[in-house]
Amino acid sequence: MIKLILIISTLLLSGCSNLYLGSKDYTDFDPQLQANQLGNTILPYEDGLRTNSKNKEYEWWYFDAKLDDGSIAVVYFWKIKAIKDFYYIGVNYNKPDGTEYKKIKFFKKNDTFFEKDSCNVQYNNNHFIGNLEKYKIKINPDDFDGFGLDIELNATIKPYRPQDGIINAGKDYFAWLAAVPNGLVNGKLTYNNEEINISGSGYHDHNWGNIELQKLFDDWLWFRGTVGEYTIIGYELNTTSARGGYSIPGIFIADSTGIIYENYGQNGIFTSKENLITGLYKKNNEALFSKLKILTNDNFYLEIEGVEVIENLYLFDV
């Protein structure tokens, strides 16, 4: 039996407030009809452009790093089709002393570039380029008030997706690829127009879909971290009552040699939550908790507890 208990300072909790979504009948999520055809080998095109600018489609490439000085940096390149096309980059930078910088900047369509064969995303002089093994990420200080990044992310863990990485309910879907579950970060960071060398550990994933997230999920809880040589991802997504009200849990444990254990869906994996979060979210928000426990029927147990809120943002306020 492997038991992993993680007491951490960050836990990503995301929730969708109760919104009126109209009277449309939605197709239920069916656990037996989830895509599982791609096999275990993940190819570079899976981190390339996956959407076609159809209405309601969205896609983002996400990166976060915990630097050796204790700082946390987050970068995400978004594209959304909502009647018209929207393109933006978001950055967050938090230092141990409480100093914080965050900004979202929009770009014109003519200033963007994407490739389908691999991850090559460029917004003006900012880019997110890689091949599942090595990535170059650049944030131009001229676009972000003197804050910038020019770094390399080198994967130490192979990419992962549960089955095909797609959660679908009829024709509606949300997809996730952990392109770099863990990696080494090296490069330069600019803050207040002063450049320093940085190093640390980092993570990159890629998400896309064709319907608003709040029309698929009530809420979700997600974690990524390390214990010794192990890289761990744990999560639970909860579909809306209109989609059947299903819980979709998952667990991933790997080291440099490969996957040690992974499980996804409702096949012998169980979750419980503790420590209701109060005083942080709106009253009509779904109940969210700061502790997640995941237990599998083959005796893997993961316990995650968040002890500090670093950032609290409304996901759909852009």
Describe each model-derived feature in a short phrase.
Residues 1-8:
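Sec-dependent signal peptide recognition
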Residues 14-15:
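C-terminal motif of bacterial Sec signal peptides marking the signal peptidase cleavage site
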Residues 18-318:
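Structured soluble/peripheral alpha/beta segments that form catalytic or ligand/cofactor-binding pockets
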